[in-house]
Amino acid sequence: MSMRGFARAGHLPTLIAALLYFDVSFMTWVLLGPLAPFLRDELGLSPTQQGLLTAIPLLGGSLFRPVLGMLADRIGGRRTALIGMVLTLATLFLGWQYARSAASFYVLGFFLGLAGASFAVALPLASRWYPAEYQGLAMGIAGAGNSGTLMATLFAPRLAERFGWAATFGIAMLPVAVVFVLFAWLARDSPKRTAP
């Protein structure tokens, strides 16, 4: 296995697009965790409510993964990812403009799980372009997008301190929108319907 062979074996633009999609999706998925102290203070949440606030997106992600995976198999990973990002943008918009109670954040958190289900789309989208000897590397590169959790943890509290927690949801829409455009431009479904 050589890096030169890897570069020629698959579709590098789709691999980059899958990495970016996975990255902003994971950033969005965990956004309530870094914002939980701000929401706790503003909404007067108990420790149990704060725990639910961070756990519900994980539940949503678990429940949405098989759905997005089946949808990707049916209509293709590219279209599924684009639909997922549109729904994620809508969820962030609702968090920015309308979510103001614990119950609304529980619902919001559940739908942020759509972003957490992204790896059921991103990994096959990238790996199906590569022969078996390179699929592990392709999935590893696309899977590095889980670094988005780090971006949320580093930047969300600072943004909330400076602009407020509600504006942080609006600001989070910006990288998702940029990746949406890049993804639409770069990503292509493999002509192979299933991985070897």
Residue ranges and their predicted role:
Residues 35-62, 103:
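Extracellular/periplasmic helix-loop-helix junction of adjacent transmembrane segments
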Residues 141-191:
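Helix-loop-helix hairpin linking two adjacent transmembrane segments in secondary transporters
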Residues 63-101:
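Conserved MFS/SLC helix-loop-helix module at the cytosolic interface between two early adjacent transmembrane helices
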Residues 39-40, 71-72, 157-163:
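Interfacial helix-cap and linker-helix signal at transmembrane-aqueous boundaries
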Residues 13-45, 68:
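Extracytoplasmic
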Residues 106-145:
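Cytoplasmic helix-loop-helix junction between adjacent transmembrane helices
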Residues 85, 89-93, 108-109, 173-180:
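A generic transmembrane-helix signature of 12-TM secondary carrier transporters
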Residues 30, 58-66, 117, 149-151:
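Residue-level signature of mid-helix packing/kink "hotspots" within the transmembrane helices
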